[in-house]
Amino acid sequence: MLVLVKLLFFLLLAFPLFGERVRVASYNVKNYLVMDRLVAGYWREDYPKPEIENGIIRSMIRRVSPDILALQEIGEPYYLNDLWRDLNASGIGHYKHSYWVRGENDEQRHLALLSRLPIISKKSHLNIEFLYFNETVRSRRGLMEVEFRTKGKTWRLFNLHLKSKWTERKDDPQAADLREKEARAMRDFIRRTYPPETNPTHIIVGDFNDFKNTAPLRRFLKVNKTVLSHMLPCRDSLGYFWTHYYAKQDSYDRLDYLLVSPSMNKYYLEGSARIADYLRCLEGSDHRMVYADFEF
């Protein structure tokens, strides 16, 4: 009997009776839409993402099994619903809630989210403006904000997809200045809406299209001496940090991140930040999913 009591005591220490674990993931699913594309060596116009790629993406999601999945590069709502339906039919646990945010009118790639947790509120911020070469421009994909409540604790997720490195401007190589200004504008919006001194609890996820030590990432981490976010150290099974493979130049880079506010960081489960590197993952997308667990 004494042995049983001791065993129960240690189990309660290891697995808190009243805790709730939430897995949050971010995944750029690479052109999950209709577009002109190369398929099996042939150029196809207005062609959907091949089913073999879709199947691999579903397989990655099933294996990670996130409770909340932030998506980038999803097409119109039809494609989100298609993915949503297929995932729910696979028996991994129903995603009961979804959210889709439309970007600019001519933007094909949008933000979306699937969740097993109830969504308390959801907002799309499409009017984030900034000055770029003396012209006021908007973030093309906007910023998604979703609010959750777990074990009585209210927290928020922001999903973003910053400007890619493709540009026609020779005076802004790789759109570095544009991306920095877009990041700064989003940072300022979050900071203004949820001031650091109020100890906001949130996570910022997505495809930042830049490296760890670049200005767009730094904008989200700190202002002067005020820490805004911590970058979670997502790694794959071999300990590598890269999340994106660029086949044209055969390069591997870290472009996808999970950034948590100091208050959110208290719920992060140490060592749970991972990169999904399962077999054939790059056949579904050129990005690898990043995810982490939180205990509330």
Identify the residue ranges that each predicted region occupies.
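Metal-dependent phosphoester-hydrolase catalytic domains
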Residues: R138, D188-I203, N209-F296
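Structured beta-strand-rich core segments of catalytic domains in phosphoester-bond hydrolases
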Residues: I74-L162
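Active-site beta-strand/loop signature of hydrolases that rely on acidic residues for catalysis
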Residues: V24-V29, I57-L80, V146, L157, ...
